């Protein structure tokens, strides 16, 4: 339904408040996982994530949610990427997206990279995340860990798909209570409040280069599909009067990732799921993003020390169950490719290469694309037919 054109760009009421947290169940597990895996500074991550919500609130005047880049998050969590390489990767993603947008290369990339290859990369990410969750995280903490994992699993199954009561929030709350009660002492809790600001970072050429190969190459094709094209379509469906174009989405995507690395922020993007999540619960303006961003700003500026302590002692079995469902969700995206045996074969090859090799995502992208066009050539009817 078309919304009234007189609607303000920013509004603060109970609907905006209700919609503000429509995607927190997806964001928090990835943020916690990245901080834990790479030892990131909590204040920097939280404050910059909050500020990016503000940026898009003012740029769009609608609930254009900001999310962690999923491919980057999965690779960082599973491979324990160093902070400098993460920042270099985020910066290289910003530069690449800016160049692709200005030159029109983003349209070319969308035509050249087959959907089967993108699905294969998602399969590889899902496999890697699920194997890490089951092999490294769920098995930690002995018997108590298995109990926590089982309870978390039951909660998620019971509430799966429930947007009003996102299961991840209840599972995260369980993990936080467990960490505070059983893993933190009085001095940790007493020192959890303080004033913190983001740390300024320096980026080296080697970090930018490594980040480009490890993180940017697998992320950009996925971003093209979910962060740009899918988000533009959903924005057009929900807010047709806004006339949001691919170019503007690409530019704000690039801007976020050109800013974030210098202040210790994680790479971020626009997410079609985040937009739908906030809209579903009532958000109609950028006010929901101001509310959502304020939560992260408050946590980062005043409670970063406490947040860091909680992340350090957060029960890995609980995090493992959350990441397992993230991985399964990524793998489910290949269902639409099962109708064509050649494309399904490419999906499997790309997924296995991405998961099994060093620099696997870059190799899988190239091999999968070449394989796709060879299959296309092989299956095309000859002129004599």
Predicted regions and their residues:
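Loop-to-transmembrane alpha-helix initiation sites
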Residues: 142-147, 167-169, 313-320, 343, ...
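Hydrophobic core segments of alpha-helical transmembrane domains in multi-pass membrane transport
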Residues: 52-56, 93-99, 124-134, 149-161, ...
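Transmembrane helix interruption/hinge and helix-loop junction motifs
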Residues: 38-43, 80-86, 161-165, 354-364
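Conserved small/polar residues in nucleotide/adenosyl-binding loops
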Residues: 378-385
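Long hydrophobic alpha-helical segments that form multi-pass transmembrane helix bundles
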Residues: 142-229
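Membrane-helix interface "capping/anchor" motifs
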Residues: 57-67, 159-168, 281-286, 332-341
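Membrane-embedded helical hairpins/re-entrant loop segments and their flanking transmembrane helices
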Residues: 2-17, 33-55, 215-286
């Amino acid at each position: 339904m078309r919304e009234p054109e007189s609607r303000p760009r920013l509004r603060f009421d109970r609907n905006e408040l209700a919609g503000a947290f429509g995607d927190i169940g997806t964001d928090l597990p990835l943020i916690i996982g990245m901080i834990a895996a790479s030892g990131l500074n909590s204040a920097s991550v939280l404050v910059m994530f909050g500020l990016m919500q503000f940026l898009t609130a003012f740029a769009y005047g609608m609930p254009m949610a900001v999310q962690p880049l999923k491919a980057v998050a999965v690779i960082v969590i599973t491979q324990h990427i160093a902070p400098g390489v993460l920042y270099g990767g985020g910066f290289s993603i910003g530069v690449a997206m800016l160049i692709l947008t200005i030159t029109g290369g983003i349209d070319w990339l969308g035509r050249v990279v087959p959907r089967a290859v993108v699905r294969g990369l998602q399969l590889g990410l899902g496999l890697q995340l699920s194997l890490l969750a089951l092999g490294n995280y769920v098995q930690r903490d002995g018997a108590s860990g298995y109990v926590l994992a089982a309870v978390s699993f039951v909660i998620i199954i019971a509430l799966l798909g429930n947007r009003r009561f996102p299961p991840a929030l209840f599972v995260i709350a369980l993990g936080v209570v467990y960490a505070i009660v059983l893993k933190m002492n009085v001095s940790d809790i007493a020192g959890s409040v303080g004033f913190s600001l983001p740390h300024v970072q320096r980026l080296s050429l080697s970090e930018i280069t490594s980040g480009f190969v490890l993180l940017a190459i697998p992320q950009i094709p996925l971003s093209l599909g979910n962060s740009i094209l899918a988000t533009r379509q959903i924005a057009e469906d929900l807010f047709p009067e806004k006339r949001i174009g691919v170019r503007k989405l690409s530019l704000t995507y690039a801007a976020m990732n050109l800013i974030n690395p210098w202040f210790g922020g994680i790479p971020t993007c626009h997410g079609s799921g985040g937009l739908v999540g906030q809209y579903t619960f009532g958000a109609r303006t950028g006010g929901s993003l101001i509310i959502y961003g304020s939560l992260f700003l408050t946590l980062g500026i005043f409670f970063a020390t406490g947040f860091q302590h909680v992340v350090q002692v957060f029960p890995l079995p609980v995090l493992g169950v959350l990441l397992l469902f993230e991985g399964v969700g990524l793998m489910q995206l290949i269902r639409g490719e099962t109708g064509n045996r050649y494309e399904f074969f490419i999906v499997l090859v790309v997924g296995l290469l991405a998961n099994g090799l060093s620099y696997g995502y870059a190799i899988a992208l190239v091999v999968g694309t070449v394989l796709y066009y060879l299959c296309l050539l092989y299956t095309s009817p000859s002129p004599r037919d």
